[in-house]
């Protein structure tokens, strides 16, 4: 009997997302319920955005939740390497095989030509897709151009008509027309693979039997299925999980809800409660109980109990469930958890240097730095009254800073400062003009320790969360203002 093997393959390009944890949990439960193995693979082929710091954050976030893996970059295993950036020669071998078999071809089209083709297709109300310009190039000519060093990608061939039948474990048979499929790039000009080739090759070589991934990948499933067919490999069973949603049913995004696992850890949620809540996203226990452990979820797990309705990630509901867990802790464990959350040495060492020189007694620490240990702050609107900026300008400055910080990938004091400075100067203000607004939103006070240091310590999600709360207190942006301010944001670059 084949051993069930599932995997999660996150990209280390930012804070660890609750959606990643959700998919990881269901992969883990499916594997364990069938006596199988769960693998962690790192998709780091985006060399510009991938960092080892983000990779470590993924490990830390999943382990904080109690999710452990059998094989991965940090624990090793018989199917490594488990970082895609270290598997380049493997992908090249299989890319070359597809070209040799006539299932893929080198494409030399420039970005300008592709943009022109796309514009013409859209003008003619056609589905934008590659037009096959290089598909019938003479192989000798293509080889000559490659040898000469001409930039190129490798594209896969796809049928131009008919339908692909996707067998989904949750939906049954899903038919998707081939006329909706592009001739997917498999190998980029830099020699690195795209998601499609890397995932198919890795899943096959690592013996993955079941692929549970987000439903946003369902429309592109025919490309993966066709690659398995081209290689002559057995395809794993596919399961497209429903996406997490905001309470307004929109796709979960950091613009509306904190999406980083690290945020919830910093807010003081118990990992058991967080995992419990993620387990209830579209799935339920047979007896419908709301509170359960990971072990109980694994014991009773049945993938067919997953609902396709679009699970709502509701912070209020999560807080309620966390409260249930907190109140059932023995008092000694409750005290230990508080110490671990607020007064762990690593966090205290980040805060202490900024507090030590400003106090004369320990009792002065709480009024000065209590905001480091808080979630949402009780804000006084009077803190946002400004001598130079009117009420609209205050909201505009704060909204633009929030948007800039949402796009910031490396959360460092210098980069945070640069974002705020850029917005201030673009609007004709000085940095010192907007800093009181940052103090008010982030610390809830008119002055405190350096707010820029505080933002770095609090981290991106908690900082953005507080800015969002402050903006809501002040009325936020109207639809008209949001449209105008987004144009301003675009001009900032």
UniProtKB/Swiss-Prot annotation:
Its EC number is 6.1.1.17. GO terms for cellular component: cytosol. PROSITE patterns: AA_TRNA_LIGASE_I. Its cofactor is Zn(2+). It is found in: Cytoplasm. A motif ('HIGH' region) lies at residues 10-20. It catalyses: tRNA(Glu) + L-glutamate + ATP = L-glutamyl-tRNA(Glu) + AMP + diphosphate. ATP binds at residue 254. InterPro entries: aa-tRNA-synth_I_cd-bd, aa-tRNA-synth_I_codon-bd_sub2, aa-tRNA-synth_I_CS, aa_tRNA-synth_I_cd-bd_sf, Glu-tRNA-ligase_bac/mito, Glu/Gln-tRNA-synth, Glu/Gln-tRNA-synth_Ib_cat-dom, GluQ/Sye. Zn(2+) binds at residues 107, 109, 134, 136. Keywords: Aminoacyl-tRNA synthetase, ATP-binding, Cytoplasm, Ligase, Metal-binding, Nucleotide-binding, Protein biosynthesis, Zinc. It comes from the Bacteria. One of its GO terms (biological process) is glutamyl-tRNA aminoacylation. GO terms for molecular function: ATP binding; glutamate-tRNA ligase activity; tRNA binding; zinc ion binding. NCBIfam families: gltX_bact (TIGR00464). Monomer. Catalyzes the attachment of glutamate to tRNA(Glu) in a two-step reaction: glutamate is first activated by ATP to form Glu-AMP and then transferred to the acceptor end of tRNA(Glu). HAMAP family: Glu_tRNA_synth_type1. Belongs to the class-I aminoacyl-tRNA synthetase family. Glutamate--tRNA ligase type 1 subfamily. This is Glutamate--tRNA ligase. The gene is gltX.
